[in-house]
Amino acid sequence: MLFSRIIAASAQRKLSVYLKKGGLVAYPTESCYGLGCLPTLAKALGKLAHLKKRPQHKGMIVIGNQLEQLQPLLQMPSENIQTMLRNEWPAPKTFLLLAKSGVLPALRGKRRSKLAVRVPDHTGARRLCQALGMPLVSTSCNRAGKRACRTEREVRRQFGRDVWIVGGRIGRQKSPSQIIDGETGKRLR
């Protein structure tokens, strides 16, 4: 299904219902396909970690179409940090910011207080979040130890019918997004 079609009302409703039931979605991002789910559903986060064979102590990245869509998951950053984020995004830059206390440990990582968030530099990924009206988890679409999927065909080969696939082209970014501590400015990846 192409991004232009996902915005059609019927497809949008179907995908939204699917995600609210704990479904997983694969979609193009800056450097590869992303694999995601709703960031507020423990069942979906567990399913995603299991499918990827990913250790559950690792945190996950959440993407949104703009900062305001991510704010319900975050403690309100200072005005300076908000200004910096608005100037930096959209970009292949993920920032670690203080998470609200109700954010699931499976999302932020066990014993961690910060959440990794990004407004991607991929129009389709932003439009997907905008069309759904909610942020999405965004991990690389691959099983642990395997290369990240770069095409719809590769997603089908690795995951079959376990995920809803949003077709489209990935961006031109060659490497994963940078990860930066939003408070200290320290680059972690």
UniProtKB/Swiss-Prot annotation:
Alphabetical UniProt keywords: ATP-binding, Cytoplasm, Nucleotide-binding, Nucleotidyltransferase, Transferase, tRNA processing
Compartments where found: Cytoplasm
The name this protein goes by in its record: Threonylcarbamoyl-AMP synthase
Residue stretches spanning the membrane: none
Function comment: Required for the formation of a threonylcarbamoyl group on adenosine at position 37 (t(6)A37) in tRNAs that read codons beginning with adenine. Catalyzes the conversion of L-threonine, HCO(3)(-)/CO(2) and ATP to give threonylcarbamoyl-AMP (TC-AMP) as the acyladenylate intermediate, with the release of diphosphate.
Reaction(s) this enzyme catalyzes, per UniProt: L-threonine + hydrogencarbonate + ATP = L-threonylcarbamoyladenylate + diphosphate + H2O
Signal peptide: none
Chain ranges of the YrdC-like domain: 9-189
